[in-house]
């Protein structure tokens, strides 16, 4: 069997580096791209370049945005006194799909994981404390995953936030033990947000 030409091998190699894309799927994608109109391939390439060029972190909550302040932080109808702390931007999107939360977010960009060398200075805990010090936030909802690292991060945040006059709550049942926020269905997340509890 003849090997693929270099241009196809190169495309397969790059596609297979994406999460969840193995060699076979990368081959199928490369073959598909060879058969779609040139315009579609150029639009895909342009969208990928734009993704890298235009996506940044919101200067307030650190979720993904294409503007300095994201649409959620810039929305005057959101309750700025209610702050939901999540691990990453995908959790923001998952909670937003429920339409059950009307507050604002703080994205940590990770969880505490000593085994992986990730400590408090490696995620956006300092920025969270800075937001709380401003006195606008009255309730903090900890919506980290229920895996060991997420629970440890939530417990650490409870201690860090004790000196401040804020109510700290945790998303409630509905999230399975060891479950991840980003993979939960909207109904489960809605129930978890509505049944949060004080810590």
From Swiss-Prot:
PROSITE patterns: RECR, TOPRIM. InterPro entries: DNA_Rcmb_RecR, Rcmb_RecR, Rcmb_RecR_Znf, TOPRIM_dom, TOPRIM_RecR. Keywords: DNA damage, DNA recombination, DNA repair, Metal-binding, Zinc, Zinc-finger. GO terms for molecular function: DNA binding; zinc ion binding. SMART domains: TOPRIM. SUPFAM superfamilies: Recombination protein RecR. May play a role in DNA repair. It seems to be involved in an RecBC-independent recombinational process of DNA repair. It may act with RecF and RecO. Belongs to the RecR family. This is Recombination protein RecR. It comes from Desulfosudis oleivorans (strain DSM 6200 / JCM 39069 / Hxd3) (Desulfococcus oleovorans).
């Amino acid at each position: 069997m003849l090997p693929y030409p270099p241009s196809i091998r190169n495309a397969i190699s790059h596609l297979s580096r994406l999460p969840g894309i193995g060699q076979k799927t990368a081959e199928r994608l490369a073959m598909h791209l060879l058969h779609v109109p040139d315009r579609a391939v150029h639009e895909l390439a342009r969208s990928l370049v734009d993704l890298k060029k235009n996506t940044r972190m919101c200067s307030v909550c650190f979720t993904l945005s294409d503007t300095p302040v994201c649409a959620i932080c810039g929305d005057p109808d959101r309750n700025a006194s209610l702050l939901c702390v999540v691990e990453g931007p995908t959790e923001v999107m998952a909670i937003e799909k429920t339409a059950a939360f009307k507050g604002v977010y703080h994205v940590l960009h990770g969880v505490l994981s000593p085994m992986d060398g990730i400590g408090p200075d490696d995620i956006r805990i300092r920025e969270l404390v800075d937001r709380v010090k401003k006195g606008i936030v009255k309730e903090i909802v900890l919506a980290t995953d229920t895996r060991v690292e997420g629970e440890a991060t939530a417990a650490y945040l409870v201690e860090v936030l004790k000196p401040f006059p804020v109510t700290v709550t945790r998303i409630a049942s509905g999230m399975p033990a060891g479950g991840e926020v980003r993979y939960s269905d909207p109904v489960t997340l809605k129930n978890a947000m509505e049944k949060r509890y004080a810590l």
